[in-house]
Amino acid sequence: MNHPSLALLDSPPAVAYISVPLAGCRAKRDWGGFAYGVETTTRTDSACNVYRVNIESRGECKRPGGKLVGVTVACAPDNGHVVGCRVDGDFFVEGDDAAVDRYLRRLNAALLDIVQRDITQCDTPPDDPDTVSYLERIARDEHVSVTSANAETILTALRRALSACGRDAARPASSRLASPASVTAHDARRRATPSAASAVPTSSVTITPAASAPQASRGLTPPTFPGEWHERWHRLAPKIVVDKPRRPQEQMDVDVQWSREVAAGERPATIRFWQWASPAVVVGRFQSIPDEVHEDVAAKEGFTVVRRCTGGGAMFIEPGNTITYSLYAPRWFAADLDIEESYRLCDMWLIAALRGLGLDVGFSGLNDIASSHGKIGGAAQRRFPPIGSGPGSILHHVTLAYDIDAVKMTRVLNISGEKMSDKAVKSAVKRVDPMRAQTGLSRDGLIARLADCLTQPDGPGAN
């Protein structure tokens, strides 16, 4: 049901509104299953519907070579007090599901505590070493590993969110963000749950990206891999499956199901080449859909928005332009390796296969695969605990750009300036280097060549 619009409250630029029916509801956005609720004031419209209303502001930060972190703060409209904080982004968090859930909830609560203490006391900058240690301790307590983001990144995003909603000006200079010009709150909008509200016209906000940092080394020199890694692949001997076409949500479900079957010892190690039945935007486990996807444009263009079980960024999927595969392996396969090494192990066969086809490719950052001209694809991982007497499993999936309508991608995805701030090439369109032009192969032909590499006598990734 569409509810009548509420009267707009006087507010600074770069804020958004959430309106929620009072009856048992809480302010909520799609945060990957981690909704946060805030108690705020209420409003009554002309039809006597009672609403809770809060004002939102968002800040972002991305350290060079790392992943984007976004923090959204919710403020009560009557007094401006911050009543909720929420972290989202492209980062990865490794740990069992319950521990990851607890970590995110504690992190959100800690940010709210930091803000409230800072506002009332104004004597300690919230990004001082003690505050950084406070956030780092939460990850240690919950036995999770946060990759490609750190406490300083989270706190900087928090300060930018506060600055965007006008809270920073009331603080002493010692507790303000060091670079106030780097405010990255963006795409302010008015939203209503359960029905969407019309956009609120907002004043323009100047977004000044952080200084450009050198792009991460792409490692285009042919990588070498330890002989012991080749032995792991020989022992793994994965089954190769070129799957039937599946719709987006079914793809997500199959990934989890097959991972759990391997974790239980009910399925052998498998590499599945996906076939997409329809276009999709696949967001990462910890991303905020409204801040990553222009949902109205996606719907108009026929894209289904789904969430995968792994971290990382959004994937733009058109069936004929995308090659996706998943590796489902027992956990021993990546035992005793750090996170970066496990990515290299799982993708060593792919690098060898693409180089065998004449592509100048290598690793970029933690989880990207790139040529000398741009990004070809990205990977993500998740570990599943043993089920019964099973070995546990590691899910490693990769999406490659066979071809791409990059202009359409920029219409559908909401790619912020902060996300591109450490890239030498600032245009998302120019950063993608599809394989179609490089190989001259059809999509099916390229998949067949990749599958052949996995079954060669010397094993995947053999030189």
Language-model-derived ranges and their functions:
Residues 2-39, 43-68, 152-172, 176-177, ...:
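Active-site loop/lid in soluble adenylation, ligation, and acyl-transfer enzymes
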Residues 16-18, 32, 42, 51-53, ...:
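Catalytic beta-strand/loop module used to bind and position nucleotide/cofactor moieties
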